[in-house]
């Protein structure tokens, strides 16, 4: 979701969440957007 497997839309989505610094695509087919602090 959130644009994956493209990292950029996922990263932007995560940056919009308070307390999150960004994100990346992970999971079996890089389809899960994972946010990091």
From Swiss-Prot:
Disulfide bonds join 4-25, 10-33, 14-35. It comes from the Eukaryota. It is found in: Secreted. InterPro entries: Defensin_invertebrate/fungal (IPR001542), Scorpion_toxin-like_sf (IPR036574). GO terms for cellular component: extracellular region. One of its GO terms (biological process) is defense response to bacterium. Keywords: Antibiotic, Antimicrobial, Defensin, Disulfide bond, Secreted. The keyword Cytoplasm does not apply. Its main location: secreted. Has antibacterial activity against M.luteus and E.coli. Belongs to the invertebrate defensin family. Type 2 subfamily. This is Defensin-A.
């Amino acid at each position: 979701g959130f644009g994956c497997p493209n990292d950029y839309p996922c990263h932007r989505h995560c940056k919009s969440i308070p307390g999150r610094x960004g994100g990346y695509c992970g999971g079996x087919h890089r389809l899960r957007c994972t946010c990091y602090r």
